[in-house]
């Protein structure tokens, strides 16, 4: 078996359900255990899923918890962390958030835009300037802090966040990045701008890594991997009619995911991207913080991922991970 990287993208509560369905399908149909990935990259919801995998929870148990099925001893951590109920959040209304006044950019943001225009992303900058959210995501991760006891998993887990002062992406857990408590890295990666409050770590504050990219798959370039599996719940399958801000967001996420996948392939790495089709998107809806359809999302993504993985052109790429 070659060296496999796993990228778990952003997507809120529905994104975690999508991860569970896709990963359970890979485990069931191919016999591949996502916990064995050489490196796991998690952004926002993906940082939670990645942490659970690195903590020993198998994909089948992620799905079982999501659909309220009985858990094995390996899945007991899910119940310890979250109980048996899906988390409940206020509805996420992107249009309403964008109507709130923006903050003025600080000197670090301006300096970066002037001195490094090739790496400056206007959309990312705009996300950092959104009015601060009021919900403290750290409250939702108290149990994670107690379970992980401040220690990072032994196997590589890279968690992506964005530094609010200058819009720069930070990859916690990657060699060369300052050590931080795991629960704070996850919290910062999940701090959806305008919805959750930014997370302070040391002298800096951070927001959701999805502000830079919904997947951040590009961080695995030049890592010597043979295959990268990307699970991108926020992506649209391709160009289509953009009716509203939700369609625009999916189109933007899909464009970034395709661009990152192309760059990885150009570097000699095979890439397989799982993204929701139209039927899955209909089940997921527009409020990615809603738990109303979690069970349906897991079931739909499980079936769709299995069908996609069975396509000859995809099956040939995944042959190295199947038993």
PLM region spans:
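Patatin-like phospholipase
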Residues: 1-43, 48-323
């Amino acid at each position: 078996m070659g060296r496999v990287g796993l990228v778990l993208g952003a997507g809120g509560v529905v994104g975690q359900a999508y991860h569970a369905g896709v990963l359970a399908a890979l485990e069931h149909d191919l016999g591949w255990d996502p916990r064995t990935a050489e490196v796991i990259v998690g952004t926002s919801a993906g940082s939670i899923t990645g942490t659970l995998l690195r903590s020993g929870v198998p994909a089948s148990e992620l799905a079982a918890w999501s659909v309220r099925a009985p858990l094995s001893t390996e899945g007991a951590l899910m119940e310890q962390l979250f109980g048996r109920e899906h988390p409940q959040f206020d509805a996420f209304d992107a249009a309403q958030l964008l109507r709130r006044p923006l903050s003025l950019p600080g000197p670090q943001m301006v300096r970066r835009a002037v001195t490094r225009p090739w790496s400056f992303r206007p959309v990312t900058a705009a996300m950092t300037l959104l009015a601060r959210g009021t919900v403290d995501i750290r409250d939702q991760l108290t149990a994670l802090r107690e379970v992980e006891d401040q220690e990072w998993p032994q196997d590589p887990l890279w968690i992506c966040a964005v530094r609010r002062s200058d819009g720069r992406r930070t990859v916690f857990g990657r060699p060369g990045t300052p050590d931080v408590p795991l629960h704070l890295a996850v919290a910062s990666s999940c701090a959806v701008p305008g919805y959750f409050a930014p997370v302070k770590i040391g002298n800096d504050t951070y927001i959701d890594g999805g502000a830079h990219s919904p997947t951040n798959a590009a961080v695995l370039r030049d890592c010597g991997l043979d295959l990268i599996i990307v699970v991108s719940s926020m992506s649209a399958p391709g160009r289509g009619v953009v009716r509203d801000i939700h369609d625009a967001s999916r189109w933007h996420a899909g464009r970034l995911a395709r661009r990152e996948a192309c760059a990885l392939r150009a570097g000699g790495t095979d890439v397989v991207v799982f993204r929701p089709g139209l039927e899955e998107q209909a089940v997921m809806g527009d409020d990615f913080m809603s738990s109303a359809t979690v069970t349906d999302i897991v079931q739909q993504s499980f079936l769709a991922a299995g069908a996609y993985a069975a396509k000859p052109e995809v099956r040939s790429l995944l042959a190295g991970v199947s038993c």
